[in-house]
Each structure stands twice: as structure tokens, then as C-alpha cells.
Amino acid sequence: MTVSAQNLVWIDMEMTGLDPEQNVVLEIATIVTDKDLNVLAEGPVIAIHQSDEELAKMDDWNVNTHTNSGLVARVKASQHDEAQAVAETLDFIRQWVPERTSPLCGNSIGQDRRFMVKHMSDLEAFFHYRNVDVSTIKELVRRWQPALLDQFKKSGTHQALDDIRESIAELQFYRSHVFKI
């Protein structure tokens, strides 16, 4: 394992909803890649215990999605709180990148960052202020080369580690088909 400022840290979180003021984090996962998007390591996948009161705030989509994926059961059984999840995630990330060097990478990663600011500020502070947001590229491709979108399909499991793997694969696809780098 080599610490490098060129490595990229990918994070995905599943939440009870979209509003960090009203909702909470259910799960967090992390993957580190090198600058060429080769996976170096998969970090911990942590379900974060939440009270029945917090879980009851979920809308139907979140209840169905997170129940069907098994996440609600994992959250109820989890012994991890947010602080423990942050500590374990940071312990993993520090093995691969210096502080404030990696942009936060993922799909719609600005949403995850909003939840970090509210609920996991120590984790958010570890990252560079920049983001590598794959969904930004997707939105541009949708407008400039829409036929390409049919060539890449995601399974959409809404499980954090799977979502990161798909985000990396999606950026690899755009790199070879859009940027041709």
C-alpha cells in the first residue's frame, strides 16, 4: 500500500432521505483508486445504527428500497454509530491518501458531501474541496452525445459499495468513449 496524493477516494452513502437537516446516514462505503481508476482497495462497508424513530421518517421509496436491499435490517442490527463509522473510514483512507489531497469522488457526490458537512464533519474536512462527480459528466453526455447513454447500464442496487463500483466503471466508460484518454 502506497500513500499518494494522486490516489482518488470514492465514497457512497445511503440515507433515509435527501435532506441532511431532516434525514440521517444509513450506510457508508469507500473505495480507493489510483489516478487511472484502478481499484487499490475497498474500505469498510458500515451500516450505521439508527433509531426506529429515524427510520420511520423515510418515505415509501426509501422504505421499499432499503428494506428490499436488506439495509434496514443491517442498520437495526448494527453496533456502529456515526462517530465510529467516521473513525473507521478515516483510518482506512489515511492508509492511501494524505489529508486534503483527494477530491471526493462518486455519483451525485455533492449530496453525500452535504450529509458529511451536517453529520460527519471530520470526514468531510479530510477531503480536498473539489469533487469528481460522475453524474456531471453523465448530464453533459445526455445533452451532447445522448446515444452513448444506452451503452452503459447500471444495476442501481442502492447498496453503497455496489454503487461505488458502478460509478468507477461509469467513469472508465466515459474516459474511453467521451474523453478518449
From Swiss-Prot:
Its main location: cytoplasm. Keywords: Cytoplasm, Exonuclease, Hydrolase, Nuclease. Residues 8-171 form the Exonuclease domain. SMART domains: EXOIII. It is found in: Cytoplasm. One of its GO terms (molecular function) is 3'-5'-RNA exonuclease activity. InterPro entries: Exonuclease_RNaseT/DNA_pol3, Oligoribonuclease, RNaseH-like_sf, RNaseH_sf. It holds the Pfam family RNase_T. The active site is at residue 129. GO terms for cellular component: cytoplasm. Its EC number is 3.1.15.-. GO terms for biological process: DNA metabolic process. 3'-to-5' exoribonuclease specific for small oligoribonucleotides. Belongs to the oligoribonuclease family. This is Oligoribonuclease. It comes from Aeromonas hydrophila subsp. hydrophila (strain ATCC 7966 / DSM 30187 / BCRC 13018 / CCUG 14551 / JCM 1027 / KCTC 2358 / NCIMB 9240 / NCTC 8049).
